[in-house]
């Protein structure tokens, strides 16, 4: 992620997101042609390499458009996409494995990688043509809207100037770093554990039909989405008073 972030400072978030999403989608789609364990390991490694920098890139992009008072709600809406993808991905995966197996000579799992990898490529191209690195470049905004966004961001930056002189050692001494790290670790561990192992657990529990496994798999993600919506409502309440810091 560090090289990706350094490159993003030079070329901007728009080109960075284009690079990440297109390469990410190409590798994900290419997984459909894997036939050996070594090919699988290489493709998974490349997927991680190309995926790195996506979340920092999105956060950096949003800081150009939203002041701190609104950033919490915007980031929460962005993160809401993860459980929603789980809700949609389970049934889609079950349908692809059941209904597309043998179509065009491809097995169901190959269609699954094709269906889930191609949208990333298309969305990456859309990001490049639709998004702008700076509000001043947004032709789809009126002059008044651009001026308002730029003013709000500048006022926020003036009220919260960046702190200099910090080192890696000082960051390691900050308790908030460990609290946030633990929070993100538990969040990602839950997401990956459910995403990777829940289908196998359901099959071992006696659910045979692949599509039914996909439907059952969406339940925990749906509950997670509801919880994040409730948290989002709390953020809307706390942001006016800015009482949400750790």
Question: Which residues make up each language-model segment?
Answer:
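Central mid-sequence intracellular linker of multi-pass
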Residues: 104-167
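Cytoplasmic helix-loop-helix junction between adjacent transmembrane helices
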Residues: 43-80
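Single conserved hydrophobic/aromatic residue that forms the stacking wall/gate
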Residues: 235-246
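Glycine-rich segments within core transmembrane alpha-helices of 12-TM secondary carriers
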Residues: 75-97, 119-120
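Helix-breaking motifs and short loop linkers at transmembrane-helix boundaries and internal kinks
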Residues: 12, 33-39, 50, 67, ...
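Extracytoplasmic gate region of multi-pass secondary transporters
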Residues: 171-228
């Amino acid at each position: 992620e560090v090289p990706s972030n350094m490159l993003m400072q030079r070329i901007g978030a728009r080109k960075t997101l284009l690079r990440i999403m297109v390469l990410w989608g190409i590798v994900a789609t290419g997984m459909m042609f894997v036939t050996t364990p070594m090919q699988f390991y290489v493709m998974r490694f490349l997927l991680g390499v190309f995926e790195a920098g996506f979340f920092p890139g999105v956060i950096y992009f949003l800081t150009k458009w939203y002041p701190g008072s609104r950033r919490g709600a915007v980031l929460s809406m962005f993160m809401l996409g993860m459980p929603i993808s789980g809700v949609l991905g389970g049934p889609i995966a079950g349908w692809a494995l059941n209904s597309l197996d043998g179509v065009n000579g491809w097995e169901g799992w190959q269609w699954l990688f094709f269906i889930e990898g191609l949208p990333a490529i298309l969305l990456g191209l859309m990001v490049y043509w639709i998004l702008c690195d700076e509000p001043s470049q947004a032709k789809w905004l009126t002059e008044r809207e651009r001026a308002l966004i730029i003013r709000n961001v500048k006022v926020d930056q003036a009220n919260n100037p960046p702190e200099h002189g910090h080192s890696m050692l000082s960051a390691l001494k900050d308790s908030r770093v460990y609290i946030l790290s633990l929070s993100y670790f538990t969040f990602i561990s839950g997401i990956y554990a459910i995403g990777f192992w829940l289908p196998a657990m359901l099959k071992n529990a006696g659910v045979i039909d692949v599509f039914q496994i996909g439907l059952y798999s969406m339940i925990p993600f749906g509950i997670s989405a509801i919880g994040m919506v409730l948290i989002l409502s709390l953020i809307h309440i706390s942001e006016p008073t800015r009482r949400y810091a750790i």
